[in-house]
A protein has these predicted regions:
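Short, positively charged, Gly/Tyr-enriched micro-motifs
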Residues: 22-90, 103, 150-153, 187, ...
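Short, conserved catalytic/metal-binding motifs centered on acidic residues
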Residues: 45, 59-60, 68, 72, ...
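Active-site-proximal, Lys/Arg-enriched surface segment
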Residues: 73-149
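Domain-level cores of phosphate- or acyl-group-handling catalytic modules
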Residues: 165-223
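An anionic, glycine-rich sequence signature occurring as long contiguous blocks
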Residues: 206-300, 304
Length: 390
């Protein structure tokens, strides 16, 4: 599905662009019957828009060897979400297992990515999810992801689109099913309070030990968290009902100690399935291993194109391309550039994700003939104004 450049000699911008094109261009895009274009032409526009963090319209406007933005979007509107998601996840898995040792167990984190959205739905109301106010809106397109942290960088394992009219647990199940197919053992599953859900907890603990941050909601949970001392206990979700779920609850007390201008006591609760041999504070320390997700989002934003289209599948495709580019960078950084040394490879600081994106941008702008001049007006400053200006 892709060929890693030769590790001898040098890795060039041309090499990076070629492998990015090799990875992204085959993504399934039905296209327009009778068109002289092929899917690769359209995906090059998307790649350039992503590494430039700009729109498809602006990308097409500024280059001579790309189709117009209307044609590009007409093609992208033919995307099939399920087929696109399936192939993209195969690629994410291929990248991940290029750099992850299958014989080493891993800590896997799952999370929702909310992409803020202004406007109405495209075809169905279920396309849009609700979120806390952000960027002047409370609606978003939502994606569920799973990742592991390797060499201090998050590697995306799986991603799926989340609809408002489906149970979020169904989306989580799709991601967990993909994670379960990886050849490495899973030591621990970590998730924030958005995954505090009976079905999610039941499914996750079947796969591995599970730690989920608990929201401070409900009188019984608030009573459990009303303490000044860390402790382990048992909690019954949906107590005395057919859906009742018992799980170990870790209640950890810590102190702000002036962090971010705050002080005093803070009490947090965690679902602690499979880690009851740990203290509540140790469970909290396990949960903090998911902190690498902020790095992932920061990198994704460096390669996420902009679009005003309401089509959720096109917006999802742009997010998938960003995730694939991020994983590809991790592969090239480790497999081609990092120098072997005792205890692991020496990861190069100079080959950053920004550099990776800059190289692709440079090569594609040359290939697609980025415009570097504009016709002058032939008039200049009127004589009367030139005289007044001295």
């Amino acid at each position: 599905m892709f060929n890693i450049p030769d590790p001898d000699g040098y890795l060039s911008a041309s090499d990076v662009k070629d492998v990015a094109e090799e990875v992204i261009a085959p993504l399934p895009l039905p296209g327009v019957e009778g068109s002289p274009l092929d899917p690769g032409d359209i995906w090059l526009v998307v790649i350039l828009a992503c590494v430039n963090q700009t729109s498809i319209w602006e990308t097409c406007k500024d280059t001579d060897e790309t189709p117009c933005d209307d044609t590009t979007l007409t093609w992208l509107h033919t995307l099939d979400r399920h087929w696109l998601e399936f192939v993209a996840n195969l690629l994410l898995g291929r990248f991940a297992m290029t750099i992850l040792d299958p014989d080493r167990s891993r800590i896997v984190s799952i999370d929702f990515i909310d992409n803020p959205y202004h406007g109405d739905h495209y075809a169905e109301e279920g396309e849009l999810c609700s979120m806390a106010p952000k960027d002047g809106t409370t609606t978003c397109h939502r994606y569920c992801t799973a990742y592991v942290v390797s060499n201090e960088k998050p590697v995306t394992l799986a991603m799926t689109y989340v609809r408002n009219d489906e149970d979020e647990a169904d989306a989580v199940e799709r991601v967990l099913a993909r994670v379960e197919n990886y050849p490495f053992e899973i030591d621990l599953l970590l998730a924030d309070s958005g995954f505090y859900n009976e079905r999610v907890i039941r499914r996750a603990r079947e796969i591995a030990a599970t730690v989920v941050h608990v929201p401070k909601k409900g009188e019984r949970m608030k009573d459990k968290l009303d303490t000044h001392k860390s402790y382990m206990t048992t909690y019954r979700m949906y107590k005395d009902s057919e859906r009742e779920l018992r799980f170990p609850l870790a209640v950890a007390v810590s102190y702000h100690a002036g962090d971010r201008g705050k002080s005093g006591e803070v009490v947090r609760g965690y679902v602690a399935c499979g880690v009851t041999d740990r203290s509540a504070k140790q469970v909290e320390r396990l949960y903090r291993k998911r902190s690498g997700i902020e790095t992932s989002y920061r990198l994704l934003r460096q390669a996420r194109g902009i679009t005003t289209t309401r089509d959720p599948v096109v917006r999802f495709a742009i997010m998938l391309v960003a995730a694939l580019l991020e994983n590809l960078w991790l592969v090239l950084r480790w497999a081609v550039v990092a120098r072997p040394r005792r205890g692991g490879r020496d990861l190069p600081e100079e080959f950053t994700f920004k550099t990776f994106c800059d190289w692709i941008r440079h090569e594609l702008e040359e290939q697609l003939r980025r415009q570097w001049k504009i016709k002058a007006n032939g008039v200049g400053v009127p004589a009367s104004q030139a005289a007044a200006a001295g």
